[in-house]
Amino acid sequence: MQVNELFKQSNTILLDGGMGTMLQAAGLKLGARPEELNITDPALIEGIHAQYAAAGSRIVNANTFGASAHKLAGSAYTLEQVITAGIENCKRACAPYGALTALDVGPLGELLEPSGTLAFEDAVAEYARIVKAGEAAGADLIFFETYTDLYELKAALLAAKENTHLPILASMSFEAGGRTFTGCTVESFAATARGLGADAVGINCSLGPKEIFPMAKRLAEAVPGNFPVFVKPNAGLPRADGSGYDITPQLFALQMKPYRELHLFAAGGCCGTTPEFIKLLNGTFAGCTPGRPAHRMPSVLCTPVDTVTVDGITVVGERINPTGKKRFQQALREGDMNYVLEQAVSQAEAGAQILDVNVGAPGVDEPVLMEQVVKALQSVTSLPLQLDSSNVEALARGLRVYNGKPIVNSTNGEPEKLAAILPLCKKYGAAIVGLAIDEKGIQPKAADRVAIARRITEAALAAGIPREDIYIDCLTLTASAQQEDVLATVQALEACKKELGVRTVLGVSNISFGLPCRTYLNTTFLTMAMYAGLDLAIMNPSSEEMMAAVYAYNVLTNRDKQSTKYIERFADRVPASTALAQAAKAAPAANAAEAELTGPYAALMKAVEKGLKGDAAAHTRALLAEKQPLEVVDEALIPALDIVGAKYEKGTLFLPQLLQAASAAQSAFEEIKTAIAQKGEGSASKGRIVLATVKGDVHDIGKNIVRVILENYGFEVLDLGRDVPVETVVDTVREKDVHLVGLSALMTTTLKSMEETIAALHAAKLDCKIMVGGAVLTPEYAEKIGADWYAKDAKRSADIAKEFFGV
């Protein structure tokens, strides 16, 4: 098969299976880097590739999954040497069978900012080095797989698009709840990866065929019918006795049969699968044609954890905009991000679904500020952003660091504007707002505005932007100055919907400028526009009347089924003028958490929950003027972290928010440490804990997250790092008199090392308990190897520590 035939196949093609599984069976030594075998034992690697190609794999992944500068640190070989050898081995093995060689690329093993310490551009640079080496060595395509962080996948995709001409397959790993480890949804992955230029999207690892199927179905529904989709499930889960995985090749082939209805581009296997698994898939997918029936694509804007499908009226918060706001302009000039972040949090709480972001003000460097504000906003809100600027460089810098799929506000009908902005939207996968205005100005007639909108739509389509990502703003003119043109805006909006098939947007509040009682005009105009087909309403979400109009409209047009959202928002509300309202204000909070948030610690607790580091520090300083340091910890910080942890467990808050809350709590703890030091006191630890990623395992993202959470609960953590020898763990526990140990392992190949570490701790007769965690672990396996607890995540680790130390 030739590369140019890759996406023209008449039958679902087969991918390969697990490489680590085969190497483990061949006796891979604990701690050895699998990728170094490309150089030290090429015959072994070629043999595995050849087995997969002979079994029917049309795309075979080179043994380069961990060939990154991060994971090869300390190796005798350079990244380029390892990748070149890996590609050459695979090509030699595949040549007799006509299979293609993919440069296999996995995560770098470090969390990106703001959740971690790896800078986005540093990640792009490292991936650029990887993909350039792969293309130079002769790879036919790039296969990004096993990603859990959408931001890291974006860095990888940008590196590939900017530095190579190779086709790209992109895959993420999802947990049983339908999200990745960092909380990314299937739909956000699909929208972002497709927008950034991936040629196919898929799901691999983590789970078996039955568990992945519902997510694969969602993935297929989230992309056009002719867009390639693939899967590579695991062979179930590792057996507790360490004898492999719990799904046989025959059962795997049987469980893959339902995937025929998805008309996949390709299918294969991941952990636990072998050439025998792939061979049986030939029968499973015989006669299965790729590609699904065409369907109307939704318009999706997203962050990793929040996917907003624009189907009907959607509220865009307008308050992050310095126009006419002296305090906001001052905050931007002074770099006061806390003020900006507070605007975001308050709008999200009021019900905004998207946030408009405009940082254009006198005396500021707008491109620099746009990048800074986008990064800062992503640390405290999961709402998608609308980047609002006429400055092309500002848009470019904001788009580059945005995590997900944003919308740009805006371009217009002027050819030079279209030429400057549409390519940016195409490159970064953003939706675009087109203003129905050109070099001749605003046209009074609806038909003339529609004509401009048509030109914008045609230009956007020609630039490769899909119709569902095109939004037209027919321009809201002030009723005080151009009353006769108000209806023309509504008429033009309705015509754009019907004639062009695009989405629409309006800055609603402009209608009332210069007139009294603006809310009346805004709400009435909003209602008129919604009836005409308005999709995005840029408005103040704190306006109760306007928000009520939105919710009521969705009920009356049957968009809010069973009035669910309307009831959720308004069930407990009563008119402010009634006696009932006064009684409601005096009523006790519905639960303990709400009661806490009404007390003297409410502001600090809210700052921690929302991840507002500056506010958390400021509120802590204010409290310390009246309260004792440990009182602030016990009455505010620990309860706030408990609230965040409970939301994390319930799935209403996700890893990025958990880490930002921990970061905000840490800023508060720093103030408390300073206060204690000034009093000449020492801060007491709630307990000492050793953490380590076991020998042979270089993955420590999960362990690092556990450390952050434990430290914020007041525990002293001795972090031994990754690839930690058994004797180092034992010696540290003995010498430091530690009574609780946390061990982490990500790979099946290092589970034996975890078992050996636990056995050594027991043999040394140390007075300690052991908790274990990692992607490949199960409660049953943890019990089998002698662990006292299985910690499924960082929150559970904190609960175990609190239980153990009695705090």
Residue ranges and their predicted role:
Residues 1-473, 477-807:
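Domain-level signal for soluble alpha/beta catalytic cores
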